[in-house]
From Swiss-Prot:
Keywords: Toxin-antitoxin system. Pfam families: ParE_toxin (PF05016). PANTHER family: PLASMID STABILIZATION SYSTEM PROTEIN, TOXIN PARE1-RELATED. Toxic component of a type II toxin-antitoxin (TA) system. Its toxic effect is neutralized by coexpression with cognate antitoxin RelB4 but no other ParD or RelB antitoxin. Belongs to the RelE toxin family. It comes from Caulobacter vibrioides (strain ATCC 19089 / CIP 103742 / CB 15) (Caulobacter crescentus). Coiled coil: none annotated. Disruption phenotype: No visible phenotype when deleted singly or as the relBE4 operon. The keyword Transmembrane helix does not apply. This is Toxin RelE4.
Length: 107
């Protein structure tokens, strides 16, 4: 006789999903970085970098506190070395304020 082993209850945990917002400055940073790499005759590398930057930003929707705490309440996360996304968590939003080369002085 078959035994009823039942089914596991569905996971009722709520997953927090933040809205990720890219500021005009952050978008300008991405375009400048990608443009610079493209000008060096490396358009495919520039496209891959842009995808990685945007994917890292999108990943902050489910894990906004993943980046390390930086200055003035900001956080930062390395998207692909040496490029760093600098952002703030504001309520239920992640606001990406800039994208910087890790060797550049913060402003």
């Amino acid at each position: 006789m078959a035994q009823d082993v039942g089914h596991a209850a569905p996971d009722t945990a709520t997953i927090f999903v933040a809205q990720v917002v890219w500021t005009q400055r952050a978008m300008a940073d991405v375009y400048a970085i990608v443009g610079h790499i493209s000008e060096q005759s490396r358009p495919l590398a520039a496209q891959r970098l842009a995808k990685r930057l945007f994917d890292t930003g999108a990943s902050l929707a489910t894990y906004p506190e993943r980046g390390r705490v930086s200055t003035q309440g900001r956080r930062e996360i390395v998207a692909i070395s040496p490029y760093v996304l600098r952002y703030r968590i504001v309520g239920d939003r992640v606001v990406i304020g800039s994208v910087r080369h890790g060797a550049r002085r913060p402003i």
